Amino acid sequence: MHGRNRTTLDREIVVSKKGKLKLAWSILGVLCLGQMAFAGGKALVEPSLTPSAENLGSLWSFELNGEYTFGSHVEKSGNLGSQAEYRYEIEALRNFRITGDYYLQLGVDYERYDFSRSNAQFPYSLTSFSGEILFSYWSGDSFYPVIRIEPGIYYTRDHVTENSFDLPIRITPGFKLTPNLYVIAGCSIDVYSNPVVFPIGGFNWKINDKFNFRAVFPRPRFSYIPNQNLEIYLGGELLGNSYRNGPTNDRRTNNAILEYSEERAGVGVDYTLRKGIDLEAIAGWTIERVYDYIRSGPINRSRGSPYIRLDLKIDLF
């Protein structure tokens, strides 16, 4: 999901810490899932019309990732105490070649956050279960979405109603400026976000065969690539989503829209075990976690804490 994770973290540019941080991420990477911008040596605007059999995209793509964020206190949370978080996500896609290096990907994505402490204002879980409709580019190694549509249910706790349905859309075309520099420009559209339409863009710069700078939101990184199977990087990450809250005794949070986000930085290792199987491990520091009831208030932020993450990606050819 990766991708998928996600992102969905569009926010009105207001004079607040959260707004400034999101604007900074947007300017630096300003790239919501615009990963087409770094499709290796192949230009997005110059696809191969008849790729060789060895270079065709996979028939199926799977991704499983899990992570743990150590406990930290949330401001203005009363006696909530130190709150830890578990998160996991599963994505499965069936890939259909349209023409050249362009594919239609259809599948499902399930993501869930579980929290060690909760109350009426802070749910014990956040869940999304969505269909995946993607128009993507195959670089020879990975798929990079140009258009992503994710119809599904996004809810807190176990409260699922007709108001839990959402339809986030992301449009992120890419362009080749030089053999080593790609840029993207597009937008994210989500009625559960504020603003509903948010501009996005960014770049990927291949410095040389060993170093790469990817200003790609939501996971920018500076990478060292000693060989074709190994990548070591220093990077950031912004993740989260918007969810429909269930009934509470507080009019500010009762059936309200909750936007949850995390900002963090860490060191990661991505290793290709064999063609089609990648394992990625990351450890770092979560700068803050934010609970934002975007249309009714309140906004609550956590203190920082360590986190660890493990991703497994499988492509079946």
Task: List where the protein language model places each region.
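Membrane-embedded beta-strand positions of outer-membrane beta-barrel proteins
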Residues: 62-66, 104-108, 147-149, 185, ...
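Transmembrane beta-strands of outer-membrane beta-barrel pores
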Residues: 66-74, 108-116, 151-157, 187-193, ...
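Hydrophobic, lipid-facing positions within transmembrane beta-strands of outer-membrane proteins
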Residues: 86-92, 127-133, 149-153, 165-171, ...
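Residue-level signature of outer-membrane beta-barrel architecture
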Residues: 94-96, 135-137, 175, 189, ...
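Repeated loop/turn-to-beta-strand initiation elements of outer-membrane beta-barrel proteins
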Residues: 98-104, 141-145, 180-185, 210-213, ...
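Outer-membrane beta-barrel translocator/channel fold
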Residues: 112-120, 218-272, 276-299
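Outer-membrane beta-barrel "beta-signal"
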Residues: 201-205, 210, 269-272, 302-317
